[in-house]
Protein backbone atom coordinates (compact mmCIF):
# COMPACT_ATOMS: atom_id res chain seq x y z
CA UNK A 1 0.00 0.00 0.00
CA UNK A 2 1.32 3.44 -0.91
CA UNK A 3 2.17 5.62 2.05
CA UNK A 4 0.15 8.78 2.58
CA UNK A 5 2.05 12.05 2.26
CA UNK A 6 2.13 14.99 4.67
CA UNK A 7 2.89 18.28 2.90
CA UNK A 8 3.43 21.60 4.69
CA UNK A 9 2.50 24.64 2.60
CA UNK A 10 4.21 28.03 2.82
CA UNK A 11 2.71 31.23 1.43
CA UNK A 12 5.76 33.22 0.41
CA UNK A 13 5.82 36.91 -0.42
CA UNK A 14 9.02 38.42 -1.75
CA UNK A 15 8.18 42.07 -2.29
CA UNK A 16 10.13 43.33 0.71
CA UNK A 17 13.48 44.82 -0.29
CA UNK A 18 16.38 42.57 0.56
CA UNK A 19 14.35 39.81 2.11
CA UNK A 20 11.45 37.44 2.03
CA UNK A 21 8.62 36.86 4.42
CA UNK A 22 6.56 33.78 5.11
CA UNK A 23 2.99 34.89 5.58
CA UNK A 24 1.30 33.90 8.82
CA UNK A 25 4.32 32.31 10.45
CA UNK A 26 5.61 32.83 13.96
CA UNK A 27 9.30 33.33 13.44
CA UNK A 28 10.54 30.97 16.10
CA UNK A 29 14.03 29.47 16.05
CA UNK A 30 14.74 30.76 12.56
CA UNK A 31 18.25 31.96 11.80
CA UNK A 32 16.82 34.54 9.41
CA UNK A 33 13.43 35.69 10.57
CA UNK A 34 10.94 34.92 7.86
CA UNK A 35 13.29 33.06 5.54
CA UNK A 36 11.27 30.28 3.92
CA UNK A 37 14.46 28.29 3.35
CA UNK A 38 14.98 27.98 7.11
CA UNK A 39 11.40 26.84 7.58
CA UNK A 40 11.77 24.35 4.73
CA UNK A 41 14.86 22.93 6.43
CA UNK A 42 12.93 22.51 9.68
CA UNK A 43 10.11 20.66 7.95
CA UNK A 44 12.58 18.47 6.10
CA UNK A 45 14.20 17.52 9.41
CA UNK A 46 10.79 16.90 11.02
CA UNK A 47 9.88 14.34 8.35
CA UNK A 48 7.72 16.16 5.81
CA UNK A 49 7.23 14.12 2.65
CA UNK A 50 7.09 17.12 0.33
CA UNK A 51 6.87 20.91 0.47
CA UNK A 52 4.70 23.42 -1.37
CA UNK A 53 5.68 27.07 -1.78
CA UNK A 54 2.90 29.36 -3.00
CA UNK A 55 4.38 32.59 -4.34
CA UNK A 56 1.96 35.39 -3.55
CA UNK A 57 4.30 38.05 -4.94
CA UNK A 58 3.12 40.51 -7.54
CA UNK A 59 6.34 42.13 -8.78
CA UNK A 60 8.77 40.91 -11.43
CA UNK A 61 11.61 41.54 -8.99
CA UNK A 62 9.91 39.25 -6.53
CA UNK A 63 9.77 36.53 -9.16
CA UNK A 64 13.55 36.69 -9.56
CA UNK A 65 13.92 36.46 -5.79
CA UNK A 66 11.70 33.36 -5.82
CA UNK A 67 14.16 31.65 -8.15
CA UNK A 68 16.87 32.42 -5.58
CA UNK A 69 14.69 30.97 -2.80
CA UNK A 70 14.09 27.80 -4.84
CA UNK A 71 17.81 27.39 -5.52
CA UNK A 72 18.70 27.83 -1.85
CA UNK A 73 15.92 25.48 -0.75
CA UNK A 74 16.95 22.80 -3.25
CA UNK A 75 20.50 22.97 -1.86
CA UNK A 76 19.25 22.30 1.68
CA UNK A 77 16.18 20.11 1.31
CA UNK A 78 16.01 16.69 -0.29
CA UNK A 79 12.28 16.09 -0.52
CA UNK A 80 10.10 17.06 -3.50
CA UNK A 81 9.39 20.78 -3.81
CA UNK A 82 6.33 22.15 -5.62
CA UNK A 83 6.08 25.83 -6.58
CA UNK A 84 2.79 27.56 -7.36
CA UNK A 85 1.42 31.05 -7.81
CA UNK A 86 1.04 33.01 -11.03
CA UNK A 87 2.75 30.46 -13.27
CA UNK A 88 1.41 31.09 -16.77
CA UNK A 89 4.14 30.26 -19.30
CA UNK A 90 6.37 27.41 -20.40
CA UNK A 91 9.37 29.65 -19.80
CA UNK A 92 8.33 30.24 -16.18
CA UNK A 93 8.00 26.48 -15.61
CA UNK A 94 11.40 25.87 -17.19
CA UNK A 95 13.06 28.48 -14.93
CA UNK A 96 11.43 27.07 -11.79
CA UNK A 97 12.37 23.46 -12.57
CA UNK A 98 15.93 24.46 -13.52
CA UNK A 99 16.25 26.26 -10.18
CA UNK A 100 15.63 22.94 -8.42
CA UNK A 101 11.87 22.56 -7.98
CA UNK A 102 10.41 19.13 -8.75
CA UNK A 103 6.89 20.20 -9.70
CA UNK A 104 4.88 23.29 -10.54
CA UNK A 105 1.31 24.00 -9.56
CA UNK A 106 -0.92 25.74 -12.12
CA UNK A 107 -4.29 27.19 -11.24
CA UNK A 108 -5.95 30.27 -12.79
CA UNK A 109 -3.78 30.07 -15.92
CA UNK A 110 -4.98 26.51 -16.54
CA UNK A 111 -8.65 27.42 -16.11
CA UNK A 112 -8.21 30.31 -18.55
CA UNK A 113 -6.28 28.14 -21.01
CA UNK A 114 -6.74 24.39 -20.40
CA UNK A 115 -4.31 23.52 -23.20
CA UNK A 116 -1.58 24.99 -20.97
CA UNK A 117 -1.81 21.76 -18.94
CA UNK A 118 -1.35 19.60 -22.04
CA UNK A 119 1.50 21.69 -23.40
CA UNK A 120 3.29 21.71 -20.02
CA UNK A 121 2.76 18.00 -19.51
CA UNK A 122 3.98 17.15 -23.02
CA UNK A 123 7.19 19.13 -22.49
CA UNK A 124 8.05 18.41 -18.86
CA UNK A 125 6.10 15.23 -18.08
CA UNK A 126 2.88 14.71 -16.13
CA UNK A 127 4.84 14.08 -12.93
CA UNK A 128 5.89 17.76 -12.93
CA UNK A 129 2.43 19.28 -13.40
CA UNK A 130 0.05 19.72 -10.47
CA UNK A 131 -3.32 21.30 -11.23
CA UNK A 132 -4.51 23.32 -8.25
CA UNK A 133 -8.28 23.59 -8.03
CA UNK A 134 -9.85 26.11 -5.67
CA UNK A 135 -13.56 25.48 -5.23
CA UNK A 136 -16.57 26.70 -3.31
CA UNK A 137 -19.88 25.02 -2.48
CA UNK A 138 -22.88 26.18 -4.50
CA UNK A 139 -26.34 25.10 -3.36
CA UNK A 140 -28.13 26.52 -6.42
CA UNK A 141 -28.84 23.20 -8.07
CA UNK A 142 -32.11 24.19 -9.75
CA UNK A 143 -30.32 26.42 -12.25
CA UNK A 144 -27.37 24.05 -12.71
CA UNK A 145 -28.78 20.71 -13.93
CA UNK A 146 -25.55 19.81 -15.73
CA UNK A 147 -23.40 19.98 -12.58
CA UNK A 148 -22.14 17.11 -10.41
CA UNK A 149 -24.42 17.17 -7.38
CA UNK A 150 -22.96 15.91 -4.10
CA UNK A 151 -24.55 15.48 -0.69
CA UNK A 152 -23.04 17.68 2.03
CA UNK A 153 -22.57 16.52 5.63
CA UNK A 154 -26.03 17.77 6.63
CA UNK A 155 -27.72 16.18 3.63
CA UNK A 156 -27.95 19.39 1.58
CA UNK A 157 -27.36 18.84 -2.15
CA UNK A 158 -24.69 21.09 -3.68
CA UNK A 159 -22.19 21.31 -6.50
CA UNK A 160 -18.66 22.63 -6.23
CA UNK A 161 -17.75 25.66 -8.32
CA UNK A 162 -14.21 26.40 -9.46
CA UNK A 163 -13.02 29.84 -8.34
CA UNK A 164 -9.93 31.66 -9.60
CA UNK A 165 -7.67 34.58 -8.66
CA UNK A 166 -7.33 33.31 -5.10
CA UNK A 167 -11.07 32.73 -4.75
CA UNK A 168 -12.09 36.22 -5.86
CA UNK A 169 -13.79 35.19 -9.11
CA UNK A 170 -16.41 32.49 -9.65
CA UNK A 171 -16.25 30.66 -12.97
CA UNK A 172 -19.45 28.61 -13.26
CA UNK A 173 -17.21 25.57 -13.88
CA UNK A 174 -17.97 22.31 -12.08
CA UNK A 175 -14.95 21.24 -10.01
CA UNK A 176 -15.46 17.50 -10.60
CA UNK A 177 -15.73 17.97 -14.36
CA UNK A 178 -12.70 20.29 -14.38
CA UNK A 179 -10.61 17.80 -12.39
CA UNK A 180 -11.49 15.05 -14.88
CA UNK A 181 -10.48 17.31 -17.76
CA UNK A 182 -7.20 18.26 -16.06
CA UNK A 183 -6.38 14.56 -15.71
CA UNK A 184 -7.20 13.94 -19.38
CA UNK A 185 -4.98 16.86 -20.42
CA UNK A 186 -1.99 15.37 -18.62
CA UNK A 187 -1.96 16.68 -15.07
CA UNK A 188 -0.07 14.36 -12.72
CA UNK A 189 -1.84 15.41 -9.51
CA UNK A 190 -4.72 17.54 -8.27
CA UNK A 191 -4.25 19.95 -5.36
CA UNK A 192 -7.80 20.50 -4.12
CA UNK A 193 -8.53 23.48 -1.87
CA UNK A 194 -11.98 24.13 -0.44
CA UNK A 195 -12.33 27.89 -0.07
CA UNK A 196 -15.23 27.26 2.34
CA UNK A 197 -12.85 25.47 4.71
CA UNK A 198 -9.60 27.33 4.11
CA UNK A 199 -8.43 29.00 7.33
CA UNK A 200 -11.35 27.68 9.40
CA UNK A 201 -9.52 24.85 11.23
CA UNK A 202 -12.78 22.90 10.84
CA UNK A 203 -11.34 20.05 8.77
CA UNK A 204 -11.12 19.23 5.08
CA UNK A 205 -14.17 19.41 2.81
CA UNK A 206 -14.74 15.67 2.72
CA UNK A 207 -17.56 15.28 0.14
CA UNK A 208 -15.57 16.83 -2.72
CA UNK A 209 -12.28 15.27 -1.59
CA UNK A 210 -13.85 11.80 -1.55
CA UNK A 211 -15.57 12.32 -4.91
CA UNK A 212 -12.36 13.33 -6.70
CA UNK A 213 -10.35 10.58 -5.01
CA UNK A 214 -12.85 7.98 -6.23
CA UNK A 215 -13.34 9.45 -9.72
CA UNK A 216 -9.74 10.11 -10.76
CA UNK A 217 -6.75 7.84 -11.26
CA UNK A 218 -4.18 10.52 -10.35
CA UNK A 219 -3.36 11.46 -6.73
CA UNK A 220 -5.51 13.99 -4.87
CA UNK A 221 -3.88 16.35 -2.36
CA UNK A 222 -6.45 17.60 0.18
CA UNK A 223 -6.08 21.22 1.28
CA UNK A 224 -7.96 23.79 3.34
CA UNK A 225 -9.18 23.60 6.92
CA UNK A 226 -6.80 21.47 8.97
CA UNK A 227 -6.94 22.27 12.69
CA UNK A 228 -5.69 19.02 14.26
CA UNK A 229 -4.37 15.53 13.39
CA UNK A 230 -7.89 14.07 13.41
CA UNK A 231 -8.74 16.24 10.40
CA UNK A 232 -5.79 14.80 8.48
CA UNK A 233 -6.86 11.29 9.50
CA UNK A 234 -10.38 12.00 8.16
CA UNK A 235 -8.91 13.36 4.92
CA UNK A 236 -7.30 9.97 4.38
CA UNK A 237 -9.89 7.61 5.91
CA UNK A 238 -13.09 9.34 4.71
CA UNK A 239 -11.84 11.64 1.95
CA UNK A 240 -9.59 8.91 0.48
CA UNK A 241 -6.95 11.55 -0.33
CA UNK A 242 -3.43 10.51 -1.28
CA UNK A 243 -1.75 13.44 0.46
CA UNK A 244 -2.65 16.05 3.07
CA UNK A 245 -1.56 19.66 2.84
CA UNK A 246 -1.55 21.87 5.94
CA UNK A 247 -0.10 25.20 6.98
CA UNK A 248 -0.92 26.86 10.29
CA UNK A 249 -0.89 23.75 12.51
CA UNK A 250 2.75 23.25 11.52
CA UNK A 251 3.82 26.91 11.25
CA UNK A 252 2.59 27.74 14.74
CA UNK A 253 4.04 24.53 16.19
CA UNK A 254 0.65 23.34 17.38
CA UNK A 255 1.72 19.90 16.18
CA UNK A 256 4.93 18.59 14.72
CA UNK A 257 4.93 16.52 11.56
CA UNK A 258 6.24 13.61 13.62
CA UNK A 259 3.30 13.88 16.05
CA UNK A 260 0.83 13.89 13.16
CA UNK A 261 2.47 10.88 11.54
CA UNK A 262 2.51 8.92 14.80
CA UNK A 263 -1.18 9.75 15.29
CA UNK A 264 -1.90 8.42 11.79
CA UNK A 265 0.25 5.33 12.21
CA UNK A 266 -1.57 4.46 15.44
CA UNK A 267 -4.80 4.53 13.40
CA UNK A 268 -3.36 2.26 10.70
CA UNK A 269 -2.81 4.95 8.06
CA UNK A 270 0.43 4.04 6.21
CA UNK A 271 2.98 6.85 6.58
CA UNK A 272 6.75 7.22 6.25
CA UNK A 273 8.26 7.72 9.71
From Swiss-Prot:
Main localization of the protein? cytoplasm
What UniProt keywords apply to this chain's record, in alphabetical order? Amino-acid biosynthesis, Cytoplasm, Histidine biosynthesis, Lyase
**Cell wall biogenesis/degradation: present as a keyword of the record?**
no
Catalyses which reaction?
5-[(5-phospho-1-deoxy-D-ribulos-1-ylimino)methylamino]-1-(5-phospho-beta-D-ribosyl)imidazole-4-carboxamide + L-glutamine = D-erythro-1-(imidazol-4-yl)glycerol 3-phosphate + 5-amino-1-(5-phospho-beta-D-ribosyl)imidazole-4-carboxamide + L-glutamate + H(+)
Q: In which pathway does it act?
A: Amino-acid biosynthesis; L-histidine biosynthesis; L-histidine from 5-phospho-alpha-D-ribose 1-diphosphate: step 5/9
List the GO molecular function terms.
imidazoleglycerol-phosphate synthase activity; lyase activity
Q: GO annotations under biological process?
A: L-histidine biosynthetic process
- One Pfam family named in its UniProt record: His_biosynth
Q: Which InterPro entries match?
A: Aldolase_TIM, His_biosynth, HisF, IGPS_HisA/HisF, RibuloseP-bd_barrel
Keyword Oxidoreductase on this protein? no
| Gene Ontology CC terms, in alphabetical order | cytoplasm
Where along the chain is the active site annotated? Answer: 11, 134
| The protein's assembly and partners | Heterodimer of HisH and HisF.
What is the role of this chain?
IGPS catalyzes the conversion of PRFAR and glutamine to IGP, AICAR and glutamate. The HisF subunit catalyzes the cyclization activity that produces IGP and AICAR from PRFAR using the ammonia provided by the HisH subunit.
Protein name (database record): Imidazole glycerol phosphate synthase subunit HisF
Query: What gene is this protein a product of?
Result: hisF
